[in-house]
Each structure stands twice: as structure tokens, then as C-alpha cells.
Amino acid sequence: MATMHYLFFGILSVAVLFLGHAGTAAIREQDVPSGYTELRSADPLVEHGDAVAINDYIGSDLRKRIIDSAVQEIGVQEATGNNDGPRVAAYLRYVGLGKGYAWCAAFVSWCYGRAGRPLPRNAWCPALFPMARRYTAAQIGQGSIRQADLFAIYSSSLRRINHVGLVRQQKGNWIVTVEGNSANRGLPKRRPLATIYAFSNWLD
């Protein structure tokens, strides 16, 4: 009788162990949704928590991802009008600067980095328009400017390029832009082509 008693509990223990293992296996083998993608930020400042996180992007269109990054920053405003504030500081840190510097080129660089492009990465506006990357006058006239290309504004008093932003689209003799450090904030704008000094292409 004792033997039957132990045999019963032995069988019961094996059954419990088998069911427990099967349950665990079922949980482990649940299918991950086919559309699931785990993404990491291309911006090390965001990745390490030094800036406010914004959404990552799924998709293969790099130009669109760059503009999406910029559009999500529309409305960012300086804290006191002195090139400051947490988001502005994040853009400047991305190019190795502290607070207080003009940040339009840093903003453009940050948007490219956010989309996974290491270059350009420079706070100096003229550096974003090397001759090798500029569009020719003929190309501009043919409507070759594309989404996420860069535009430059020239300062006669400084005798150099002193503002840069992103082209969102070209509409005839106008461009629609997203730019940082415009009226102390991130803004969309419409600018006539005649006011643009140069365009550059960092993607092709």
C-alpha cells in the first residue's frame, strides 16, 4: 500500500513538472508581431537620456525621416532669447558646444544625426555648404532641389553664410522650410528662391 502511495505522488509530481514546462515553453514561443521593430536613437544625446526623447521612425525614406525629425521640433523655443533652453542645449551638445551659441546649423546637424546620418555635424553655417556639395544655378533652375537638402542665407554685413535650414519642398519659385534659430525658435517658413544664397546636398 505504501508503495502505491509513493508511486501515485511520483506520477503526480512528474505531471506537474511537465505541465509547468509546457506552459513556460508556450510563453517563450509566442510569436513576436511581424511588424515589430526595436529602434535605437541615432542621436547619442537622446540615446543616453541627455535630451527629451522623441519618436523613432520606421521606414526606408531617409529624406523623409530627416524632415520628420525636424517637423517634430517645430515650436521649440529658447528659454530667455539667448540661445538657451533644454532642447537648444541638446542641439548644441550634439556639435560639441555649450549653451549660448547660434544654433541653426546645430539644429540641421541634429536632425540628420537623428535619422542616422553622421554628417553634416557642424555648428558653423558656411561649413555646411562646401562647393562639392552645392547645387549649380542650372540645377536649381531645373527644379533639382529635394526634400532634406539644405538652404543658406547670406549676410552682407558679415560677408558670409549666417543661416541654414532644411528644405521641406519646393513649390515653383518658393521653398517650404523647417529651420531652427529663426525668431528664437524652430519654425516652418516659405522663402522665395531669389533670397536663397546656396543649396547643398549631403545625401547623394
Task: Annotate each language-model stretch with its function.
Residues 10-18:
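Bacterial N-terminal signal peptides
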Residues 27-29, 33-117:
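N-terminal capping segments
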Residues 16, 24, 113-114, 128:
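General secretory precursor processing signal
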Residues 2-6, 10, 23-33, 46, ...:
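Aromatic- and glycine-rich peptidoglycan recognition patches
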Residues 62-68, 97, 117-187:
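...with weaker cross-activation on analogous glycine-rich loops/strands in unrelated enzymes
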